[in-house]
């Protein structure tokens, strides 16, 4: 009888533990913003909402994206096989400095309106490099400007004000930092960088909502949240997979990449037509 009772109690405890674990953390795949909007209805000042940037908030327009079309990706990889990492940074800086950007989903404006109206703490978390990058003097300022231009200002939403340089995490791709409510990891693991920001500021929310297009980033933050006993909602955002692939002209693209490699210029189609009139004939 005692053994039976003990086993029953153990099973009850195990069930309770599993239930608690399930409620503390979950990751779901979403293709639109409706699940995020629903989560925000239950959020308050004790929630931290974290947004990835590329392919979640913004992305380059079709003419300027470098990796969404297989042929462009192939041309880029061919150049990469010939050049050093530093030379590639230079070319990437040239190309990205001319890029035009678009929203992934215009409905994000309503999400940010809700965050501002209800004063829900929010930050951006991006793995982008920092510091000088090719002809871009400070990549962090370049990134923040694009966000501001498209309506994403985290300065009044971030719970951690000011600028924070994380020199202890510094590697070859720049210094991880917090600036204007944007955490830039310089290719350091997102969870590791976020943990440093939270520790330095002694700020620990009760709940984290994180939206990212890369599953491993979500899993990394899920583990961190578990360690910190923070409830976690991960949203694996796949909206870009439903956006039609850019329509390109392979002949034009090949010349475009040749000019990029040899002359360090990234031309749009109109500029290419002016440079090489025969392309439009």
Question: How would you name each of these model-derived features?
Answer:
Residues 21-25:
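Boundary at the C-terminal end of the N-terminal hydrophobic targeting segment
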